[in-house]
Structure formats: C-alpha cells, structure tokens
Amino acid sequence: MATPINPNDLDLTDRVVNINRVAKVVKGGRRFSFAALVVVGDGAGHVGVGLGKANEVPEAIRKGGENAKKNLFRVPLVGHTIPHEVLGHFGAGWVLLKPATQGTGVIAGGAVRAVLEAAGIRNILTKSQGSRNPHNVLKATVAGLKLLRSAEQVSRLRGKDVEPAKLAGEQRG
C-alpha cells in the first residue's frame, strides 16, 4: 500500500462536477437535499474525488471537498501526458485514456476533463462510452488513472533495468 498523501502539503484546487437535488417525500410534502460530486487536485499529479451530501448546496460542496482530500492518489505523468494507454471501467461505463503529443490539449468531456485537469494532464485523448452518469464516468476515469504505471514501476516489478533511450514516453510531452 502506498503512503497516504497529506492534503495540507499540497496546493489543492477544487472543482464541482455535478450537483444533484434529491427529494424525500414525507407526510408534509417533499424534503430536498443535495449531493455534490467534487474533484480536487494540485495540477502536478495528485488528484482526488469525493461525494458530499447535505441539506444545503454549500455544505454538500464542502463535504465533497473534504471527502475528495481523503481520497487523494498520485498519477504518474510523462511530461504533461500519461505513460501509456489505459481503459477504466466502473458500472456500465468505461473510459479510454490515450497519451497524446505536445499541443494536443485535453480532448475530453465533462467529468473526465475535470479529473484530468485537476491531475495536471494537459495532452490526452479520451473516449467514454456506456453510462453517461457523471458518477460512473468519474469513477471509471479514476479507475483508469489508478491502473497507470510509470516505466520505472514496471521495470521494478519485472526485475529489469530501464534504459533511458528505450522509454517510449520521452518523445511525448
């Protein structure tokens, strides 16, 4: 297990991806509450996703931000892109993440874009299919990012030496 990331050591920015109003029907009518899906990141490889629920929107966003800070993880970066292609699944949704060359930009929509920008990824190609629910798309993106391994990590797992000239990610930016 990796060492936990202390959110106080990072300069985190948060971004609200989705706010959902939920109604509970009671004898006197409807009682509304809110659920906020929040992404936090430092733009340098650390990102977290959280869900906050409360009777008021600002409180739900605050709780979502706190929850996201508890779920921070590190994304291995090669320049401003990812080291290799990966497919993240969650529920009925899946997200394909492909590394891109310098100048491509973030080709992603909605929830996927929020996570990638918070992580500091500036050049990437994505495709999300299946579920269009922001919760499922967000969690599929996070699942994909957690599957990423740097060349150094793979070489350590395989017991091989890394030759700098053979790193495929060095041509990307």
Swiss-Prot record:
GO CC field: small ribosomal subunit
Keywords from the named record: Ribonucleoprotein, Ribosomal protein, RNA-binding, rRNA-binding
Coiled-coil features, chain-numbered ranges: none
PROSITE patterns, per database record: RIBOSOMAL_S5 (PS00585), S5_DSRBD (PS50881)
GO molecular function (one): rRNA binding
InterPro entries reported for this sequence: Ribosomal_Su5_D2-typ_SF (IPR020568), Ribosomal_uS5 (IPR000851), Ribosomal_uS5_bac-type (IPR005712), Ribosomal_uS5_C (IPR005324), Ribosomal_uS5_N (IPR013810), Ribosomal_uS5_N_CS (IPR018192), Ribsml_uS5_D2-typ_fold_subgr (IPR014721)
Any one biological process term the GO annotation gives: translation
Organism domain of life: Bacteria
Domain S5 DRBM: residue ranges: 12-75
Membrane-spanning residues: none
The family this protein is said to belong to: Belongs to the universal ribosomal protein uS5 family.
The protein's assembly and partners: Part of the 30S ribosomal subunit. Contacts proteins S4 and S8.
PANTHER family tied to this protein: MITOCHONDRIAL RIBOSOMAL PROTEIN S5
Domain notes: The N-terminal domain interacts with the head of the 30S subunit; the C-terminal domain interacts with the body and contacts protein S4. The interaction surface between S4 and S5 is involved in control of translational fidelity.
Function according to Swiss-Prot or TrEMBL: With S4 and S12 plays an important role in translational accuracy.
Record protein name field: Small ribosomal subunit protein uS5
Organism of provenance: Myxococcus xanthus (strain DK1622)
Lineage: Bacteria, Pseudomonadati, Myxococcota, Myxococcia, Myxococcales
Gene: rpsE
